[in-house]
């Protein structure tokens, strides 16, 4: 029997909420937003250098499938929760239901911090690609715009991108679902086109043996620490790329048949992105016929930065039409991604504010006549801009430390937010009110694996990513510091203080509004 809006509204009412957002999204659109936020055309390009410089081909050819499989386990655990509790509050609501008000409060804040960081990192990451494209199409651009200062150029482009994404979310509400649907096919056919170009266009290719065995350490850390420290830092490529899939849960109140569609949207977006991303990355490695140039820090030899995938593509294709073709495909894919990220972030902020958890919640929970949470969208965008300001200071380490710090914040905060309800579901055991889509008895080992993986990556990604970022080390420089632990840890400390001084006296968790 087909589900109706009344079925969805009844399920939402059972959770304590009336229908305020417009429920117009199909199951495919729900999947599409998570697939768009994961965006292999974004993460596989912008954080490729992290894996290349910290591990090399081994971190990609062997690391990607292993980490992607572990993330799929995490996603399956979350799908079960999404089916049981189909509300825009998502992770925060699950934690509140299973672990109480305090668990929900901290989970919600971690989730929000992570979503803001994801939005910011995608918005900032695409600026390098826009900069290069503008430089190839307009002579003199590189030296005239913002006085030729590359750092300022990227930040100005970042501001423009965030403004455009905000305007689309504010006034293009009827187009958002359609945009995400288009984004899916753009990612599928665009990635396929790039793979075909990199297979057939270059005159020479790397060997399969090199692709699966070559090790590279451009991190500055000792080779003795390769396996236990350097290589795991390279896994940030996978862990960052395949994230943001909680968007399917945050869009539950706008999705038809959300108790099944949100669950499927989460795990399918991970599965298909994992497969597609691996094929795309292997094409990059196959085309890497001049690794010495990619490893060079001499701008006369490598104009795109050490470990850059753009350098690989440029060496393989030259700077002509095919190079521009690939750059246009990835750039538009990343722009789709940042718009979807802002949508997801604003919905979570709306839901969290609806329960009174955020300062200014009375304004942030408001929706206009079109069912759009206007204030939540604007504040989400401004918060993303604020945490990216350190990118204006050039790192002495020679890598975009501020960018990778924002990436680390996104990964740590989001995955810790994922971990809390997964652990609480494991603890609940047979008392968990399973929905129609569930894991059965397999939840025991799946939830355990998910928790262990998240704890491990959270430890690694708060560590220094360059020797000059190690406090007390020779040549220490604050611009090389990974400020992910400062933001995440500092935020948690402030939240803990706020909780004990005030919040615990008035915050009641999810508030029924019917």
Regions found by a protein language model. Give the residues of each.
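Terminal cytosolic tails of multi-pass membrane transporters
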Residues: 1-27, 422-446, 464-514
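Transmembrane helix-boundary motif of multi-pass solute transporters/channels
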Residues: 14-128, 239, 245-248, 326, ...
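Selective recognition of specific alpha-helical transmembrane segments in multi-pass small-molecule
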Residues: 40, 66-73, 119, 187-202, ...
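Hydrophobic transmembrane alpha-helices that form the core helical bundles
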Residues: 46-53, 62-63, 72-162, 167-170, ...
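Membrane-interface loop-to-helix entry segments
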Residues: 153-212, 243, 266-271, 407-420, ...
